[in-house]
Amino acid sequence: MKQKLLVIGGPTAVGKTDLSIKLAKNLNGEIISADSMQIYKYMDIGSAKVTKDEMNGIKHYLIDAIEPDTPFSVADFKQLGEEALEKIICNGKFPIISGGTGLYINSLTCNMTFTEAEKDESYREYLETLALEKGNEYIHEMLKDVDPISYKEIHANNRKRVIRALEVFKLTNKPFSSYNVGLDFYNSEYDVYYYVLTMNREKLYDRINKRVDLMMEKGLLNECIRLKEMGYNSDIQSMQGIGYKEILYYLEGKITLEKAIDMIKQGSRNYAKRQLTWFRRDKRCIFLDKDIMSDDEILDKVINDIIKN
């Protein structure tokens, strides 16, 4: 019998953290955070990081796990996540994944193979230069002979993906498309229960706007100033996150603070929209509408689904 694994997904500000902690209390569980920003140390307010008080005694993994300037990929998350899952199960606890980064969730629940550990920076730079000089179509055509499947599946303008496909072939002598071919993508060693919280779009957007205002009240500006003083600037991946890059624009004198706040709100709303699009594409997701169901009804449904099966 497969080990059961619970996933709580959904857009930003929908209430995933609160639900996952209540579920962990009821199921004797521990939580893996699948959030691309909460994994970084010192980035607390802008990432709406769960606090020690909010954790309510529930152990969380992959929060404050790496320095802000540490290069971090989905493959890295998969490795850390698998180690966390093993610890949770060995501790006799129920594993719960909670977060809004769909790709991170998939890395632990789908049949995904990564070759991210293998990189050739000089070849990447060569291809980037080639694309700038001769156009995206030129490097896209290079794919035709070595990986015709990726050539058809990856659009010429998705330069990053085209470069990655060419790089994988150069490093492994195997086409990028050969990874996962013939395998059921959703095949997992776990019995996955995947729930996604939703609510009326206008209501969600209002929650997002209010949360950004609360972040400013809690000291997001000072958090960004402190990060900048620690040497973390816009040239690193983590500082390109929503809430950080906009405040950096303000600190660099490029925009007003009011404009930065508006941009954070707009960026967060756009991100929520993309998150929902991602989850709707996943055939495993069971959507729980918070406009129709109360928090207690959602809690009861998830617990009953897991217990009765």
UniProtKB/Swiss-Prot annotation:
Keywords: ATP-binding, Magnesium, Nucleotide-binding, Transferase, tRNA processing. The record marks T101, R124 as: Interaction with substrate tRNA. It comes from Clostridium beijerinckii (strain ATCC 51743 / NCIMB 8052). GO terms for biological process: tRNA modification. Catalyzes the transfer of a dimethylallyl group onto the adenine at position 37 in tRNAs that read codons beginning with uridine, leading to the formation of N6-(dimethylallyl)adenosine (i(6)A). Substrate binds at T12, A13, V14, G15, K16, T17. ATP binds at G10, P11, T12, A13, V14, G15, K16, T17. It is an enzyme of class 2 (transferase). InterPro entries: Dimethylallyltransferase (IPR039657), IPT (IPR018022), P-loop_NTPase (IPR027417). Belongs to the IPP transferase family. This is tRNA dimethylallyltransferase. One of its GO terms (molecular function) is ATP binding. It comes from the Bacteria. The gene is miaA. Its cofactor is Mg(2+). It catalyses: adenosine(37) in tRNA + dimethylallyl diphosphate = N(6)-dimethylallyladenosine(37) in tRNA + diphosphate. Monomer. Residues 35-38 are annotated as: Interaction with substrate tRNA. Its EC number is 2.5.1.75.
